[in-house]
Regions:
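NTP/phosphate- and nucleic-acid-binding module
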Residues: 1-482
Length: 482
């Protein structure tokens, strides 16, 4: 079963929506299991940000035109587009990536992120790339505006936010008052953003509506270089793929934070701290370490105002490496722009603060989790699909099965379900179908333990508990369930 069929069948992700009207690409519904998993992802992000004294805020989704002029999005927030001879449109970088993968080549061998439109076109011509359905491409690349426009009141031009960050910066004066006019401090928000993508695809990996979890930490320029880092942070290692190693076609390396600072791989201690936090967060999802890397932006790929930028990438089974987060040193660019356009003073402690940003895509994390932890295996000539979720993100700790719905077994199952629900928030009861079918159903959604209530349960208060991963069953006392 392919990953998209699996997600649809098991109530993770449905769409494109609205399905009854044939759907619009780039818009999806999270079903009950999908929403539960997404909440787990967001809870891990929320917990880690909050533990690091980065506090949650919520800002508007829509802002007037002047905001996006100041931020630099208006007219400049674009993707390269190319048309085929029948008028079909294609996002250039993704077209090239798909071509390379199809031809057993890796996009990692080419600095696609640093190419301009002229270089893209030359690459397409040299490689004789065609559209996905084999049509010739026109020899022109144009920039497609990603901003989604709307109106406020009768005729005031406004736009949906294309990321949460800009709207998070705008209340800076209020933050500064709230934090008693002392730097550094941090805020984050988890919310929707919108981009008018040329060709949304691969489920929630590239949608027109998506969720971001972005933290913004404000420092003075001096603080950025001087903040204290404890021994645990300095000794911790991160899987890094520097732009130098990329250009020399070398693999990622595990390097300690301390070494990164000594070798000037990281340009400030504040940035090192942000990278450490991003690495700590991603480790909580239980991804195998070989599937994680931080890829540094090439100098000609990086935004002109950024001091440093790294993408946190996960290697999936269906899409190879995908970006799930970005860690950026944005210097004082954003607040400087908004100070200039608004004519409001956004200084703190005598200068405009610099911003460290950790920007996670929660939809991409959900997709990566399902893609990596969904396994298909043969068991006694039968196909078993099992979602081997790590404990930190498991949807259900227990599923309770009555062997029959009669003779008091259903009532006993409901009693045990109720007892377990007092201790845990992820216990379900499943009463339909054979026990074997119920095992398979729970395996598919990652339930860790299945508990069967049978006639012996009524006699001696014991149950059969079966482990998801090993399928081993054992008999234990109800009081020993944990």
């Amino acid at each position: 079963m392919d990953i998209h069929s699996y997600m649809k069948k098991n109530g993770f992700i449905w769409g494109p929506e609205p399905e009854i009207y044939d759907g619009v690409a780039g818009f999806y519904t999270y079903g009950p299991n999908g929403k539960k998993l997404k909440n787990k992802v967001e809870d891990i992000l929320r917990k880690n940000f909050t533990k690091n004294s980065i506090h949650e805020v919520e800002t508007p989704i829509i802002a007037p035109e002047i905001v996006w002029k100041a931020s630099g999005h208006l007219g400049k927030f674009t993707d390269p587009l190319i048309k085929d001879i029948k008028g079909g449109v294609h996002r250039v970088d993704k077209l090239i990536e798909d071509f390379l993968i199809k031809n057993n080549d890796s996009p990692d061998n080419y600095n696609l992120g640093s190419m301009n439109n002229k270089e893209f076109l030359k690459f397409i011509i040299d490689k004789k790339i065609k559209s996905p359905n084999g049509l010739e491409l026109k020899k022109e690349i144009i920039n497609h505006d990603l901003m989604m426009e709307t109106k406020v009141s009768v005729d005031r031009r406004a736009f949906n936010r294309p990321e949460t960050a800009t709207m998070t910066y705008l209340p800076f004066k209020s933050y500064y008052e709230f934090y008693r006019k002392k730097l550094p401090f941090g805020v984050f928000q988890i919310g929707k953003a919108f981009r008018n993508e040329i060709s949304p695809r691969n489920s929630v990996l590239r949608g027109r509506e998506f969720t971001q979890a972005e933290a913004q930490i404000f420092y003075s320029e001096d603080q950025k270089k001087e903040i204290e880092l404890n021994k645990d942070i300095l000794k911790s290692e991160i899987p890094l793929w520097s732009h130098k190693d990329q250009s020399e076609r070398k693999l990622k390396k595990n390097i300690s934070i301390e070494s990164c600072l000594k070798k000037s791989i990281f340009k400030s201690r504040a940035f090192a701290k942000a990278m450490h936090l991003a690495n700590k967060i991603i480790s909580e999802f239980g991804f195998p370490i070989e599937r994680i890397r931080f890829r540094q932006h090439n100098p000609n790929e990086m935004a002109f105002y950024a001091e440093d930028a790294w993408d946190l990438e996960i290697k999936t089974n269906s899409q190879s490496w995908i970006e799930v987060a970005g860690i950026h040193d944005r210097k004082d660019y954003d607040l400087s722009q908004h100070q200039k356009m608004s004519n409001k003073n956004l200084e703190a402690e005598g200068s405009i603060p610099h911003i460290m940003e950790l920007a996670f895509g929660t939809d991409r994390l959900v997709y990566s989790i399902l893609d990596i932890f969904m396994n298909q295996e043969k068991v006694n000539n039968d196909n078993r699909i099992v979602l081997k979720l790590p404990s930190s993100i498991q949807l259900n700790k227990f599923a309770v099965f009555p062997l029959q719905k009669k003779d008091g077994l259903l009532e006993k199952a409901q009693e045990i379900h109720s007892i377990l629900n007092e201790k845990y928030d992820n216990v379900i009861i499943d009463i339909s179908g054979s026990i074997g079918k119920r095992y398979r159903r729970q395996d598919e959604i990652g339930t860790k333990n299945c508990i069967t209530i049978d006639y012996d349960t009524l006699k001696d208060n014991t149950v059969t508990i079966r482990d998801r991963d090993t399928m081993v069953q054992k008999r234990i006392k109800i009081k020993d369930l944990k």
